[in-house]
Amino acid sequence: MDRDVTNTKGLDFEDFGLKRDLLMGIFEAGFEKPSPIQEESIPVALVGRDILARAKNGTGKTAAFVIPALEKINPKVSKIQCLILVPTRELAMQTSQVCKTLGKHLGINVMVTTGGTGLRDDIVRLQDPVHIVVGTPGRILDLAGKQVADLSECPMFIMDEADKLLSIEFTPVIEQLLRFHPKDRQVMLFSATFPISVKDFSDKNMTSPYEINLMDELTLRGITQYYAYVEEKQKVHCLNTLFSKLQINQSIIFCNSTNRVELLAKKITELGYSCFYSHAKMAQQARNRVFHDFRNGVCRNLVCSDLLTRGIDIQAVNVVINFDFPKNAETYLHRIGRSGRYGHLGLAINLINWDDRFNLYNIERDLGTEIQPIPQTIDKSLYVYENPESIPRPISNLKPAGIQQQQQLSIPSTAVGRLAGTGPPKRFWSVWPSRPRRVPRQSRPLWWPPWRTFPRLPARAGWAPELRRPARWPCAGPKPADIPCSAGLGLSLSHLFGALGGVLTIAISSPP
């Protein structure tokens, strides 16, 4: 554990005066002592004051607002008493699960609602008592506008990842949602970065908020950052070298576009490593399944876009690889924050090319950190978990177990910061099929790239093997499946015309 979560005042959860049932849920979930952000925010939230909290990724921000919300909710009142807004569907599912886990002894009903799911199901669920609603802004505004979700008596308005929710795309929706709440509501904002838009929102909609800033530096101390300078066509070869050398519990590989996500996932699968992929254009059910399986350790590697950069907490992830280098410091900060969760160690490796050199300089300047060139040897103690039992087991049907046993990273390099491997590099774009035959979605595994094709079906009895079509004419000799279609057709025509000739001869020679 590093100082980001251990540098506390020495308080215990019992010191906050929480309900006994809530304390039972907290301790059963594995919490021992509150983190710094929880020590600062829980007492202030319990007295009903607005909060503007800024803390690093992976330091316990979710529990910092869920615990006081659960404490203040009255289960006997069948009204929505807390609204938690998040920017992504996966984060909504994760936050709702935290609410259910911590409050399982309180008799509190938690509902999660996001876009991409049936509106009818949400309407039916809101007919029953719901105390906490977790969701994305657009869907909740839709429910409130249809007068299905009654927010007129909802005293708590919480925004996680507030910097994203107060961007240009979400701000109009947030402003409309606030009109459904009472004027004496309690507003709490939590995030790792606070742009100027957050200050404008707090001045307009918050009453003397209590400001918490635990960001003496932006990046987590437990995350070691390196970059490797490679050409674009050598990135996959470089990634293969990293997989074979690093001791990876679970890894997340980020790309800048959805097309590259799917193509890279296909390449990783061809290299023999278990791999899932996820991006915003996938069906919601498929995204949920991928997120659930990866979180449970079904697979070691996940390729994704910036969809999973915010709030996703998978503590088994110890390596983050930026296959495509991000364009700004905010995206970079949230990407590498997927490793090193809650005081654990993590490793961030960035594959950069000539066009990324200015972005690298700008990110180092904005974050006040230095990204080192990758050394020839990376010490395991910088990123390997101390407790091996917490490491999820990957699937083993794609590659023998030995391929996943990585040693210390010892990479021959001809120049500092350049990662080289043995053997000729493979072109990244050289395997695109000329005419892809898509697999039906209902029979396709979730991690199977959509351009994977079925093997060609063998010839069936009664089908000509050359043209894969039924032989239309009966023919003597072997079965139609054993002879060319043209041969069968020729024999059949000769017999036909022979028979017709005999009929015509009889007809002509017969007397009138």
Swiss-Prot record:
The keyword Disulfide bond does not apply. GO terms for molecular function: ATP binding; ATP hydrolysis activity; RNA binding; RNA helicase activity. Pfam families: DEAD (PF00270), Helicase_C (PF00271). Its EC number is 3.6.4.13. Residues 42-212 form the Helicase ATP-binding domain. It comes from the Eukaryota. InterPro entries: DEAD/DEAH_box_helicase_dom, Helicase_ATP-bd, Helicase_C-like, P-loop_NTPase, RNA-helicase_DEAD-box_CS, RNA_helicase_DEAD_Q_motif. GO terms for biological process: mRNA processing; mRNA transport; regulation of translation. GO terms for cellular component: P-body. It is found in: Cytoplasm, P-body. It catalyses: ATP + H2O = ADP + phosphate + H(+). A motif (Q motif) lies at residues 11-39. Residues 222-382 form the Helicase C-terminal domain. Belongs to the DEAD box helicase family. DDX6/DHH1 subfamily. This is ATP-dependent RNA helicase DHH1. It comes from Chaetomium globosum (strain ATCC 6205 / CBS 148.51 / DSM 1962 / NBRC 6347 / NRRL 1970) (Soil fungus).
